[in-house]
Structures are given as C-alpha cells and as structure tokens.
Amino acid sequence: MDYINAIGRRKAAVARVYLSEGSGKIVINKREIEQYFPSSILQYIVKQPLLKLDVAAKYDIKINLRGGGFKGQSEAARLAIARALVKINPDDKPALRSEGFITRDPRVVERKKPGRPKARKRFQFSKR
C-alpha cells in the first residue's frame, strides 16, 4: 500500500489526508498533532475514527489543513480520515456512519444580505 488520500470539509476548513501504513504518527501542516492542536479535545476529535476502528497504531497520517478555525479544522480532518479508512476497507463504513463520522456537516455561515447589518439582523425600526 503506497498511500490513500481523501478530502474533508467543515465550515471554511479543508483537510487533505494522506494515509500510509506505519506506527500511528499524525503530522498536520508539517507539525506534530500535539503542537498543532494543543487542546486534547481537538486531538481526540481528529483521532475518533481511528479509535473507533482500533487502528490508531496501524497508519501514519499526513494532513494538510487550510482555512477556518481550530474546531472546523479538527472536524474536517476527522471526516477526511474517516473517508480514507473507508477507501481502505469498505466494510468499516457502517461502523463509522453510526457514529456520524462519514456525514458532511452542511452548516456554513449564512451570507450578509444587502440593506441589513448582518445576515438576519435588521436595522432598528422606527414607527414615527
């Protein structure tokens, strides 16, 4: 196995994942996961599909992350890793889907409308 690649998106974040057989090392934008995501919660979000299938020490993962914030980036990486694992073994898809790792979250920021200060907010209305 050379390497498997997959893309995951969440909000404004895009994650490109390259999965290869190895010892469980995760590198994000040329930095270790502990340095890129200091929060253990965000590290856990990224590792969730690997822990669910119990293959955390089986693959080395290289991730390129762009755009968005920390939370969006971690969830984009989670989706990309889940998609890559399904490419390797399609039998894992039901287990990952039941946890919601395969589903792309479609919620994105609503655009600002003209004639309003924000997407939904209106300027103060004066009756008289």
Curated annotation (Swiss-Prot):
Keywords: Ribonucleoprotein, Ribosomal protein. GO terms for cellular component: cytosolic small ribosomal subunit. One of its GO terms (molecular function) is structural constituent of ribosome. Residues 113-128 have a biased composition (Basic residues). Residues 106-128 are annotated as: Disordered. It comes from the Bacteria. InterPro entries: Ribosomal_Su5_D2-typ_SF, Ribosomal_uS9, Ribosomal_uS9_bac/plastid, Ribosomal_uS9_CS, Ribsml_uS5_D2-typ_fold_subgr. One of its GO terms (biological process) is translation. SUPFAM superfamilies: Ribosomal protein S5 domain 2-like. Belongs to the universal ribosomal protein uS9 family. This is Small ribosomal subunit protein uS9. It comes from Porphyromonas gingivalis (strain ATCC BAA-308 / W83). The lineage of its organism: Bacteria, Pseudomonadati, Bacteroidota, Bacteroidia, Bacteroidales.
